[in-house]
């Protein structure tokens, strides 16, 4: 099923801690304790084929059966179990993975290996800052994470806003831009996105993000709440120009409102996910 184009949901019903120790790469963690809240958003179409998976513990304590009952009560009908759970998956010779957000992290590593995304370690970045070099640090995490901890002097530019805000902030082509996150993945994706967009400045990903900065013994700030200005018309025009070039280069498709409405009214084909990439304030 995984190797076909047929849509189905592979749902791991264990708690995230158990899931993180060992799971199938393409499985989504929807623990029984949060199933009623998470499933309607994750799998909006109720006739979607759903495969539930757990481990021996799950079977022993009827977690799978209870999860199936919960899903039936929510309106889902096409539900089955992976026979033997993750143990049978492993015994058949297939890999199991540890951690969370494993698939997206693997994608980040693939991007870095494919594009040779430039990177800089914490010590080298600190040296550049101390030498007062022309450098800006963009923290690509959401505002809530940025407020928790951040690198001194970093600007909070969430990943989806990097190009949107770039030309308003970076006015000198000699400025070096470093993109950071908490670890690696969002730094890599953010930096490579700017590079692919053709911005004129040198761009690098901060290796291991705020975690690497902390492990190197450098100070982290808390409760930073600086709000960046809305980009000017000229900055927006430059960002839009880069966006269109990227869309053309990679064949990004565009749909009009009528097509979107058609998809929203289609309840029998596939699940539709409509993602608003603006800030929570703009969304509200």
Model-found features: residue ranges?
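Rhodanese-like catalytic fold shared by cysteine-dependent sulfurtransferases
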Residues: 1-9, 13-136, 140-273, 279-284
């Amino acid at each position: 099923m995984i190797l076909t184009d047929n849509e189905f949901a592979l749902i791991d019903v264990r708690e995230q801690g158990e899931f993180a120790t060992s799971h199938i790469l393409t499985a989504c963690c929807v623990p029984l304790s949060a199933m009623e809240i998470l499933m309607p958003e994750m799998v909006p179409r109720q006739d979607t084929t759903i495969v539930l998976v757990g481990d021996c513990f799950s079977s022993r304590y009827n977690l799978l059966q209870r999860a199936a009952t919960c899903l039936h009560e929510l309106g889902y009908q096409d539900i089955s179990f992976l026979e033997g759970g993750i143990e049978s998956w492993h015994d058949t010779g297939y890999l199991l993975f540890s951690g969370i957000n494993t698939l997206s992290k693997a994608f980040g590593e693939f991007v870095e290996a494919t594009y040779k995304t430039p990177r800089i370690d914490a010590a080298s970045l600190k040296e550049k800052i101390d030498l007062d070099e022309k450098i800006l640090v963009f923290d690509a995490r959401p505002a809530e994470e940025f407020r928790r901890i951040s690198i001194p002097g970093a600007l909070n530019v969430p990943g989806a806003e990097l190009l949107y805000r770039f030309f308003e902030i970076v006015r000198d082509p000699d400025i070096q831009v470093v993109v950071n996150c908490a670890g690696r993945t969002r730094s890599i994706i953010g930096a490579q996105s700017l590079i692919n967009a053709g911005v004129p400045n040198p761009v690098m990903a901060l290796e291991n993000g705020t975690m690497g900065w902390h492990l190197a013994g450098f100070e982290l700030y808390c409760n930073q709440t600086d709000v960046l200005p809305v980009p000017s018309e000229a900055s927006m025009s430059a960002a839009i120009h880069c966006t269109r070039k990227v869309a053309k280069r990679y064949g990004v498709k565009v749909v009009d409102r009528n097509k979107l409405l058609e998809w929203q009214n289609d309840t029998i084909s596939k699940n539709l996910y409509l993602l608003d990439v603006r800030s929570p304030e703009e969304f509200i």
